[in-house]
């Protein structure tokens, strides 16, 4: 155990476009080598793709909502400016993102506990801040592992898959829950 005091919680400034602390933390999770503007472009671009895909699914079904077909219709013309100007698209993208994060958040995890010479995997409940942190981390990690061409598309498709209950991040959550369920016999070792 650490002998120092717990680190003080730092206040996170909300992101400039959506005014959401949750999204600001997600941008920080996407950020590499301190390049925040690049991370913002990736996240906002992904949310733009998510908003368009959700609008296409709910609204105009006839235009074709798959990514095939090249430059179909007006999708390529107004690629990034859409969520920056359209309030409805912005709200839709944020709701979809929050839904994806909620579906990826784990409830329990296993922690190693050494008792009498043997190590047990003890299931413990996770506090909310860690749930969100794990969900953000898994979304970014499994978006990186996808095969789409750009990180914008990878992240957008991972978010959409998470909302629909599939994808790598959801699989990771199910694996963590399965491990906790399998080791439920050791729950009385909880501390």
Curated annotation (Swiss-Prot):
One Pfam family per UniProt: Ribosomal_S7
One annotated GO biological process: translation
Top-level taxon of origin: Bacteria
Residue ranges, annotated region (Disordered): 56-80
InterPro entries referenced in this protein's UniProt entry, alphabetically: Ribosomal_uS7, Ribosomal_uS7_bac/org-type, Ribosomal_uS7_CS, Ribosomal_uS7_dom, Ribosomal_uS7_dom_sf
GO molecular function: rRNA binding; structural constituent of ribosome; tRNA binding
Listed GO CC annotations: small ribosomal subunit
Keywords recorded for this protein, A-Z: Ribonucleoprotein, Ribosomal protein, RNA-binding, rRNA-binding, tRNA-binding
Binding partners and assembly: Part of the 30S ribosomal subunit. Contacts proteins S9 and S11.
Family from the record: Belongs to the universal ribosomal protein uS7 family.
PANTHER family: RIBOSOMAL PROTEIN S7
Role according to the record: One of the primary rRNA binding proteins, it binds directly to 16S rRNA where it nucleates assembly of the head domain of the 30S subunit. Is located at the subunit interface close to the decoding center, probably blocks exit of the E-site tRNA.
Protein name in the entry: Small ribosomal subunit protein uS7
Species assigned in the record: Coxiella burnetii (strain CbuG_Q212)
């Amino acid at each position: 155990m650490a002998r120092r005091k717990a680190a003080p919680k730092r206040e996170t400034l909300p992101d400039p476009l959506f005014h959401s602390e949750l999204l600001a933390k997600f941008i920080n999770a996407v950020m590499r080598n301190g390049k925040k503007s690049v991370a913002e472009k990736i996240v906002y671009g992904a949310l733009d793709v998510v908003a368009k895909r959700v609008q296409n699914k709910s609204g105009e079904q006839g235009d074709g909502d798959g990514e095939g077909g090249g430059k179909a219709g007006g999708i390529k013309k107004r690629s990034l400016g859409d969520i920056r100007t359209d309030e409805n698209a912005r709200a839709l993208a944020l709701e979809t993102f929050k839904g994806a994060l909620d579906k990826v958040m784990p409830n329990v995890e296993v922690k190693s506990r050494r008792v009498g010479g043997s190590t047990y995997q003890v299931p413990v409940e996770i506090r909310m801040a860690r749930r969100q942190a794990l969900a953000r981390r898994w979304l970014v990690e499994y978006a990186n592992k996808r095969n789409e061409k750009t990180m914008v598309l990878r992240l957008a498709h991972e978010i959409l898959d998470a909302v629909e209950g599939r994808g790598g991040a959801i699989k990771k959550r199910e694996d963590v829950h399965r491990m906790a369920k399998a080791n439920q016999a050791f729950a009385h070792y909880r501390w």
